[in-house]
Amino acid sequence: MPSAGERPAVKMGPAPAGEQHRRATEDPEVMELAFEGMDKEKAPSRKRARTEPPAEGLLQPVNLSREELYKEPTNEELNRLRETEILFHSTLLRLQVEELLKEVRLSEKKKERIDNFLKEVTKRIQKVPPVPEAELTDQSWLPAGVRVPLHQVPYAVKGSFRFRPPSQITVVGSYLLDTCMRPDINVDVAVTMPREILQDKDGLNQRYFRKRALYLAHLAYHLAQDPLFSSVRFSYMSGCHLKPSLLLRPHGKDERLVTVRLLPCPPLDFFRPCRLLPTKNNVRSAWYRGQSCPDYEPPTPHYNTWILQDVALETHMHLLASVLGSAQGLKDGVALLKVWLRQRELDKGLGGFNGFIISMLVAFLVSKRKIHTTMSGYQVLRSVLQFLATTDLTINGISFSLSSDPSLPTLAEFHQLFAVVFVDPSGRLNLCADVTASTYNQVQYEAELSMALLDSKADDGFQLLLMTPKPMIQAFDHVVHLHPLSRLQASCHQLKLWPELQDNGGDYVSAALGPLTNILVQGLGCRLHLLAHSRPPVPEWSINQDPPKHKDAGTLTLGFLFRPEGLTSVIDLGPEADKPEAADFRQFWGTRSELRRFQDGAIREAVVWEAESLFEKRLIPHQVVTHLLALHADIPDTCIQYVGGFLDALIQNPKEISSTGEEALALAVRCYDDLSRLLWGLEGLPLTVSAVQGAHPVLRYTEVFPPAPVRPAYSFYNRLQELASLLPRPDKPCPAYVEPMTVVCHLEGSGQWPQDAEAVQRVRAAFQLRLAEVLTQEHRLQCCATATHTDVLKDGFVFRIRVAYQREPQILKEVRSPEGMVSLRDTPASLRLERDTKLLPLLTSALHGLQQQYPAYSGVARLAKRWVRAQLLGEGFTDESLDLLAASLFLHPEPFTPPSVPQVGFLRFLYLVSTFDWKNNPLIVNLNGELTAEEQVGIRSSFLAARTQLPVMVIITPQDRRSSVWTQDGPSAQILQQLVSLAAEALPILEKQLMDPRGPGDIRTVFRPPFDMYDVLIHLTPRHIPRHRQAVDPPVASFCRGLLAEPGPSSLMPVLGYDPPQLYLAQLREAFEDLALFFYDQHGGEVIGVLWKPSSFQPQPFKASSIKGRMVVSQGGELVMLPNIEAILEDFAVLGEGLVQAVEARSERWTV
């Protein structure tokens, strides 16, 4: 043992490959994933790739001679192909893995710079002067510029302390194992405190931890004076408040290169192992509580584990070095697993399933021969995920130890003391001591999802598995923030958690976490699939500040993943009244429990929740959580921020805030079903009805604001008796907007149908007229017939029935040559008819079925459309294209599961829109699972071959495998890029709002359009905006729209499709389409945005036929035309007289 003047042994820098004598920390540095930085750096490049040619330096096709092209492969190439076939399931996967590992690994140059910095750190530590011996409670020797990085409660403790230079300084952890990851490189340095400053009973009553903290404080003060370091700060080691570490960062250009963490530890054999068994007590009740425990001293398993973790540094490093030393595949596997954990936020803070645990798990599986050292990183990843998916360490723990020593605890004893059990080779230390059951259940669940994804061998499996982040707000249906954390002190008192507080050193958050989650899991019952929690890492702090208190650790956030089939249940059934379990049920639920008699005659305890609409039923967990936390944990609802339905307000009718419209949609669908039965049973038609199909967003539950039964107030209309219809009065506000719901009615085939397209149209027109007569005669329905459709008023809803003949699209395709030969060729008319009468009804039927399977689909699709239209981009996207985007989130949710609530689905919609590579990939929406994997591969190949002929956004369905019919007419490349940019901006803003424990603030922020980008703003008067109440910011008061609460004396056909702003827009586009683009939110927008087309300001040659909107000027002796802006702006106002309130020319944005 060296004396104060002797030079300590030092081990620095990376050890040679294969060296077995390395030391490791029990918990190597928690690495920040490279992709957090990469996302910011690469996002722009990803967008540039859509519009710009390949950047210089990217690989390009090479022209090879025929001899070079067909020459035999070399031995090296053959070996690589054979290895790829054995170790990876595809060449693409191997390339992706290799590229990812390149991104996260340290370069040799950076390693050399880090090694040099570590050598300098060692020299500085060796020069820190000693301190004379003093009592632990006498800390007057500490300089004024440093504070002890530990809460010393209780302050009085026996023992003495003196500082001596460390007996050994060792670089440990993932840096030496070559498994650390960029961009935030942390290097752990174990600083072994000399034996002479420790005493035999230092394991008792936090004495060891007090000495450890004082040792760090003295180091911190002296190292902070050194110009080598740009910053010297304290931090908690893996979130454990009893184990601070000292962070050192180099000065100058390498400031962001590395962070060195100094970790004091005791000599290897200083503590007697038998005293640190998890069943032992090392925190006396008399010392901690001020009173002795009359019966027995409770065990302190976590406290003992934290000491053992420091003791076992060397042992664990030896183990990992011997296993991973020269096995590159194992190192690659550990790196991939760390990426996997980080993307799922599983490795954060105290209790995280961190990189050290996963490294030890790899070593365990190697020892059990479930992993071989010759495996590739991908195979290691698969093997570990398979093990995690199929092994529940909360029930069946695992152990390195093969010892039969009776003095060692059994796995059963470990399970009594810890939620998750993974025992190290000593047989005494549980590596997962801090991991909660909830965290491990989440790890296991994610492993199951990942294995299913890998087994599917999807082309984008690697991207979804390792490159797609899964933040809690997107991964879980509901999120709960508990704030302030100080309230959990009352919870500990209510739940009588004194032993847990004693074990956790006063950390009331850790003490209460397990009991709280158990209560909520029991209360949510069959509704709950998974509960997770997130504790943000405690930030580092200055050495001259006191350490953060537990209440300053941020917020405790809980995430709930629900089972869709149980989420909306309004009753929790308990046992029968005469059963012994009934008393436990009443105690658990308190006053909410009541006796009820059920239809089968049974009298049972039950809890009934107040909820009628689907919106209210989705929020029943909110009632459960607030009730149980108040009852059992003394946490009032003022300390609970429940995030589950904030976005639902955007699709609520302002007059019906207790519903998000699913009931209104269901009412309209039932009315459609009734009408369908009437059509099927009609007897007065010459041909029978062969099929009735819906073809409207209402009938697939995706209409943003569902229609209500229309009961017109006739005082708002002039009546046209001869047509039995109404006409809006000009002196009244614009009446309510009524949109008819399209229904396609197929008639049976017959030889009487003509074979000429024009004749077919005439026959169809006759059927439309006859249909109106028969419906009026047989069912007394109000009908209005035209040549193309029949409008039918039923129960306040208007349906637009289109008669269809199955062969008409084919007849329209027939082209007759001069020689009389008939060939089939797609024409615009045939394609339009096929889309409207065949593809659209099939899509509506499929999406209707999707809604029955996933009740949240309606809310997700409607929120998505509400947001797109609120950005004034609704005209660029068809209803069907946005419905399919929403459907893809349910049919292809990987790496998630289908959302159970609209809020989560909308966040994922924004992520999909902003990250999908629209230029190089089609979005395949496999409705009803009709497309096989081979067919999807073929679709992607066909897409690449025909990319230049396809629209900028391509959405493929089983019925539309090539042409992307729903995006043929838009969006344009510019509109799509604008949507992508807006989604990329909105997502982080919205996520930050929803994860704010103080509440989301103004949730409508991301729905408000960016008006600053427009050249002209046309302001409309609300009097003539029929959907004014649907605005993102609904008005406090609006105009009466001529609707009665109850049906009037008679029922006339209301005015259909009357929306003055939309009619005005159509006029503007017709008149000025060559000069400007017009943007508007059809849901109550008060402003039309105008963008001048760049080409419109270019001088045009004079043409008398193109003089509209332009003025003639002379340039260079020639007459040219330029836009007459003043006249155009005046025309805007004239065309919209009575509707336009003002025209705001934002001339600072443009000049002629």
Curated annotation (Swiss-Prot):
Region of interest (Disordered), residue spans: 1-30, 36-55
Keyword Coiled coil: yes
An individual GO BP term: ribosomal small subunit biogenesis
Phosphoserine sites (modified residues): S65, S292, S817
Coiled-coil portions: 92-128
Main location: nucleus
A single MF term (Gene Ontology): RNA binding
Family: Belongs to the NRAP family.
Name under which the protein is recorded: Nucleolar protein 6
